[in-house]
Amino acid sequence: TGELALAEADAMDLLTEDYISLGPLHGIPYGLKDLFDTKDIETAWGAEPYQNRLPLEDAEIVKRLRAAGAVLLGKTAVGALAYNDIWYGGRTKNPWNLNEGSSGSSAGSASATAAGLCGFAIGTETLGSITSPSERCGTTGLRPTFGRVSRSGCMALCWSLDKVGPICRCVEDTGLILSIINGYDENDHFSINAPFNFDSEKTTDDLKIGYIPDTFGADTTELDKDILRIVSDLGFDLQAVELDNLPYSSLINILHAEAAASFEDLTLSNKDDTLAWQANEAWPNSFRKARFLSAVDHVQLDRLRYLVMKAMDDLFKDIDILIGPFDVGPMLVASNFSGHPC
């Protein structure tokens, strides 16, 4: 992508010389998770079997960012098939501690943004792949509402769960990027027509903030606990809330089933044996185990998902924002499987 980046940057310079600006992203370099198609540029999904894969056209998000003047600096490393931070090139390192990984699967996007290698990056999330590396690398990740950002031209892992969002170094930047990549796309059948509205004059006086006490227990870090104190010191009225007692973790079987269906050919051909990560919890084993789920299991999981969606809707009838560690308790599963932003 080096030649492409220079060509796009030169094009932005020429427009600038003519006093033409394409907007706030004019000339800003960004990194793109290597799940998104880039015409005639390798998009390997971090996985050995897909090396040398050359897409015929750009993903929708690439087109939108180019139209806004952003410069594609490079593709960022992704955990193989959107899981973990291990790919065919090794493990994506954490810029703050090179002995640690960046978490995944938007590992390279978070690592590169944290290291200042790009102005922002694009990531995806099925279950924690924006929020986890952002927490790990100290970036600000935004996982938008399901369907808000087009996935056209992006590797499909789980049709009912995959989401696309920005990884930046501050909150304001995530809003700016979302305003550009947001919007309906007829080529993504799950796309929704949700306008982006931001009122800088709106006060926070009436903002209702909730938290789940159980997620701030003994295993929670002091930094997480400090958040409650900071929010309270800012004058907000914190409300303790509870989420319905449901077997949330069971929904992960839906993720495994959809992912196994997406890569059934990989499993049946035994090419998943070439993936670098072969642990018990890695994709090759998960794909195979998912084939033992019955039709009855799927019906029951769909019923459970409906109950989780209803529980989340009921929760947000009383609050506007829920704060807490995203990976403690049921919220990582509940919010992803109900399509809520984070």
Which residues does each predicted region cover?
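An N-terminal boundary/leader segment
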Residues: 1-10, 233, 287, 291-292
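Short, well-ordered alpha-helical
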Residues: 1-52, 81-83, 87, 200
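Acyltransferase
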Residues: 10-13, 219-242, 263-276, 298-319
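Short helix-loop capping/hinge segments that flank enzyme active sites or metal/cofactor-binding pockets
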Residues: 25-45, 203-212, 253-309
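Glycine-rich, small-residue loops and helix-cap segments
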Residues: 27, 33, 67, 71-75, ...
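A short helix-breaking turn/cap at a secondary-structure junction
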Residues: 143-225
